[in-house]
Amino acid sequence: MSSSLGKEKDSKEKDPKAPSAKEREKEAKASGGFGKESKEKEPKTKGKDAKDGKKDSSAAQPGVAFSVDNTIKRPNPAPGTRKKSSNAEVIKELNKCREENSMRLDLSKRSIHILPSSIKELTQLTELYLYSNKLQSLPAEVGCLVNLMTLALSENSLTSLPDSLDNLKKLRMLDLRHNKLREIPSVVYRLDSLTTLYLRFNRITTVEKDIKNLSKLSMLSIRENKIKQLPAEIGELCNLITLDVAHNQLEHLPKEIGNCTQITNLDLQHNELLDLPDTIGNLSSLSRLGLRYNRLSAIPRSLAKCSALEELNLENNNISTLPESLLSSLVKLNSLTLARNCFQLYPVGGPSQFSTIYSLNMEHNRINKIPFGIFSRAKVLSKLNMKDNQLTSLPLDFGTWTSMVELNLATNQLTKIPEDVSGLVSLEVLILSNNLLKKLPHGLGNLRKLRELDLEENKLESLPNEIAYLKDLQKLVLTNNQLTTLPRGIGHLTNLTHLGLGENLLTHLPEEIGTLENLEELYLNDNPNLHSLPFELALCSKLSIMSIENCPLSHLPPQIVAGGPSFIIQFLKMQGPYRAMV
């Protein structure tokens, strides 16, 4: 039985000015009704070139995919704030813009079906934003806006563009994301002043050879389409800095990609790539390369020439080895993700290959050993993820990993943690769940910066008293072990907010648990020998979630136990010696 404690239900206030059904119907007819809110946030209404936002899903967190155009999004409005517009209101906005000689017009989120032809009069405009409307086409008159530099049409239902747009000789940014284009409109290839082109999330299947005409492009995003190949002419985009072709159906890249030597960000994740051309080594400016979720079985040696590379993500391919000395050649590499591949050993190349690495993710491979000394030069290595491998032990120099901040060793076959874990003095997160640990080293108490310790699903029978020294600990997970008691020193963990003790053999909780003044979540479920709870538990004033399923608690009145956690806490408050304090 799990419960949220002390939560009050939000009262629902009625809108005193709610429109009648007839009024709503009349308004709906005038505005054309509302469309569903798009799940993608709106881009900012600025015509600046977009840069990759760090730390997507996908990214630039190490081991996480990155999206090169996600920094131009702006938050969705609060519910109920979407604007309704009749055609008359839109015309009114156009007139106001003309009278004030405004250079910027934002008609986003107006449920516009058809843009009035009078738009042609606003020849002074340099920026026009039409995000999140219901446009299926644009009037030819938009071609009269000869000073336009930014045209934002994201989140509409466009299937084509008028040929008159080729009059927009000054257009630099064109945003066509989230429309219904089945091809790149031919007029787009004639907009040779474009520097930024967003075509994400359409239904495009091909990129024509005419892409070569857009020689000024620095940003091209065509992710989330159905593109099966890129033309050789892509290599003529010599000013390209960011190329995002993620989430398509590419099996190969043209060798001409090597001519795009200015590229810094290349996102190819979630395709069907079987190989990479050797010419990729010509991308001397490349700093971020995303190749996760493809079908690669090898990486070309030429990649070693990409000496500016800082982030390399190869997650979920079929790679079992890397070219020797590849990593040592990438002297600026700080984030390396090799998760979900076929590695049985660490890459060949010795300690020097990790000298600049900050984050290393090798989760879900078949590695059974971390070589001794492999991190002896890894002075900045802060995050290591070895989850879901076949480790049975840790190297003898384990205690020298003094820069480590986050260490994930979950889902291996470790039977013990070396005593010299005490040397990992920078450690803040330690994940050891799903191993074969029967006890913990006393040196664990030296990890004074530890905020999270996860020991779920091991074979622990007790905890060392030194755990009391982990005073910064906020999350302690001990679920599914064989604990019968807790050390009294657990009461010193006053910063603890989450304590997982479910699926153990606990017979009681120490009264010191009452000193956990910041405890918010307590999981006691499935402890078949837990018959009572200490009155001191009532002193945990911030406790909001407590789980007691499948605990007998026979020393408490049955009707109290049946009432659930909130009843139990109330009982402990009122019946215990601390009722005057709570």
From Swiss-Prot:
Start-end of Basic and acidic residues biased regions: 1-29, 36-57
First and last residues of every LRR repeat: 101-122, 124-145, 147-169, 170-191, 193-214, 216-237, 239-260, 262-283, 285-307, 308-329, 332-353, 356-377, 380-400, 403-424, 426-448, 449-470, 472-494, 495-516, 518-540, 542-563
Residue segments, region Disordered: 1-88
GO terms for cellular component: cytoplasm; cytosol; nucleoplasm; nucleus; protein phosphatase type 1 complex
GO molecular function per UniProt: protein phosphatase 1 binding; protein phosphatase binding; volume-sensitive anion channel activity
Record GO biological process: cyclic-GMP-AMP transmembrane import across plasma membrane; intracellular signal transduction; positive regulation of Ras protein signal transduction; regulation of MAPK cascade
Cellular location(s): Cytoplasm; Nucleus
Keywords, in A-Z order: Cytoplasm, Leucine-rich repeat, Nucleus, Repeat
Pfam families noted in UniProt: LRR_14, LRR_8
Motif residue range(s): RVxF motif: 63-66
KW Repeat (keyword) present: yes
Domain of life: Eukaryota
InterPro entries: Leu-rich_rpt, Leu-rich_rpt_typical-subtyp, LRR_dom_sf, LRR_domain-containing, LRR_R13L4/SHOC2-like
Domain observations: Contains a N-terminal RVxF motif that is important for interaction with PP1c. PP1c (all isoforms) binds to the concave side of SHOC2, via LRR 2-5, 8-11, and 13-18. M-Ras/MRAS binds to the concave side of SHOC2, via LRR 1-10, 12 and 14-16.
The protein's role, per its UniProt record: Core component of the SHOC2-MRAS-PP1c (SMP) holophosphatase complex that regulates activation of the MAPK pathway. Acts as a scaffolding protein in the SMP complex. The SMP complex specifically dephosphorylates the inhibitory phosphorylation at 'Ser-259' of RAF1 kinase, 'Ser-365' of BRAF kinase and 'Ser-214' of ARAF kinase, stimulating their kinase activities. The SMP complex enhances the dephosphorylation activity and substrate specificity of PP1c.
Protein family membership: Belongs to the SHOC2 family.
Subunit structure: Component of the SHOC2-MRAS-PP1c (SMP) complex consisting of SHOC2, GTP-bound M-Ras/MRAS and the catalytic subunit of protein phosphatase 1 (either PPP1CA, PPP1CB or PPP1CC). SHOC2 and PP1c preferably bind M-Ras/MRAS, but they also bind K-Ras/KRAS, N-Ras/NRAS and H-Ras/HRAS; these interactions are GTP-dependent and both SHOC2 and PP1c are required to form a stable complex. Interacts with PP1c in the absence of Ras GTPases. Interacts with M-Ras/MRAS and RAF1. Interacts with ERBIN; disrupts the interaction with RAF1 and Ras, preventing the activation of the Ras signaling pathway.
Protein name as it appears in the record: Leucine-rich repeat protein SHOC-2
Organism from which the protein derives: Bos taurus (Bovine)
